[in-house]
Curated annotation (Swiss-Prot):
Cofactor: Zn(2+)
Catalytic activity: an N-acyl-L-aspartate + H2O = a carboxylate + L-aspartate
Cofactor note: Binds 1 zinc ion per subunit.
Organism listed in the record: Synechococcus sp. (strain CC9605)
A GO molecular-function annotation: zinc ion binding
UniProt: Zn(2+) binding residues: H13, E16, H104
Protein name: Probable aspartoacylase
NCBIfam families: PRK02259.1 (NF002601)
Length: 304
């Protein structure tokens, strides 16, 4: 690796328009976001999907970073774009980056939040620094064989900033502002690590992925009930064991069992209907921060 640059990606999904608009404004006004002296590469993840205002053209780009398929030359616009991003800005690319920050929005009531994939020490260090600065909740997504190939996993360190709720395709000033705050906090944290100024909090609070639930469906795949109105909008919240998950058109509740301590996230996210996900379930955990997390991030940024 010849650079510790930072890759900032917006528009990984073409109908998530707020982060691309923010990057366009940043390009026009470099003082809009403090890059903290870092070498930042600003990229639209899926330009064609953004032009069409659709999530993707052939396949979800954020599931295309699969080494085996990329090595075999998998076809389709998004696989080609994934390979191009790695050739340009991957750890050994033409303009190599060590860190990737992927900017997303959601129709779910996730607020301003972070998504971390797995338990790489450098990722956890960056997430802990941002959580310590802004108090953002963290969704730790791991051990889900049905959901793989995420963009940030192809860089040595990476986080997703996820902001919502906002309808697909709608520009919203509040969402843009929250995205900017999250991005600036990430860049500031990386600067502090490089300058030996970073101080990790004592603990990291994560919501660890347990699995996902789909809507009840008939044999033909049509939903028989929808997310319960009292569950809608309750991302990150403790749910009573008696709370119904779903409600049918006639008002009948579907009371499937909750396991104690389960907390929903991405409740009724519009884009996940095609993935047969009505919401995901997590468990809130408090982890002691380990010294090797910050060391891993320091070593990564010092490798330039």
């Amino acid at each position: 690796m010849s650079s510790c640059g930072v890759l900032v990606v917006a528009g990984t999904h073409g109908n998530e328009v707020n982060a691309p608009w923010l990057l366009q404004q940043w390009q026009a006004n470099p003082d809009l976001i403090d890059a903290a002296g870092l070498a930042v590469q600003k990229v639209i993840g899926n330009p064609e999907a953004l032009r069409r205002r659709c999530r993707y053209v052939d396949r979800d780009l954020n599931r295309c970073f699969l080494p085996e398929q990329l090595e075999q030359g998998a076809s389709g616009l998004e696989f080609q774009r994934a390979g191009e991003l790695l050739r340009l800005h991957g750890p050994s690319g033409e303009q190599p980056c060590a860190v990737a920050i992927d900017l997303h929005s959601t129709t779910a009531a996730m607020g301003n939040s972070l998504v971390v994939y797995g338990r790489r020490p450098a990722d956890l260090a960056l997430a802990a620094l941002v959580q310590g600065a802004l108090g953002l909740p963290i969704y730790l997504h791991e051990a889900d064989a049905q959901q793989t190939g995420f963009l940030v996993e192809s860089w040595p360190c990476g986080l997703v900033i996820e902001v919502g709720p906002v309808p697909q395709g709608l520009l919203n000033a509040g969402v843009v502002e929250q995205t900017r705050l999250g991005l600036e906090s990430c860049l500031r944290a990386l600067y502090q690590v490089r300058q030996e100024l970073a101080r990790l909090p004592d603990a990291l609070v994560v919501h660890r992925h347990l699995g996902s639930r789909d809507l009840p469906k008939a044999e033909n795949g049509e939903p028989q009930a929808l997310v319960h109105p009292e569950l809608q909008g309750r991302d990150w919240q403790n749910i009573a064991s008696t709370q119904a998950m779903f409600r049918a058109a006639d008002g009948t509740d579907r009371c499937e069992a909750w396991v104690g301590g389960e907390i929903p996230v991405f409740v009724n996210e519009a884009a996940y209907a095609e993935k047969s996900i009505a919401f995901s379930l997590t468990r809130r955990e408090v982890w002691p921060v380990e010294p090797n997390w910050l060391l891993a991030l320091k070593q990564l940024l010092a490798a330039a």
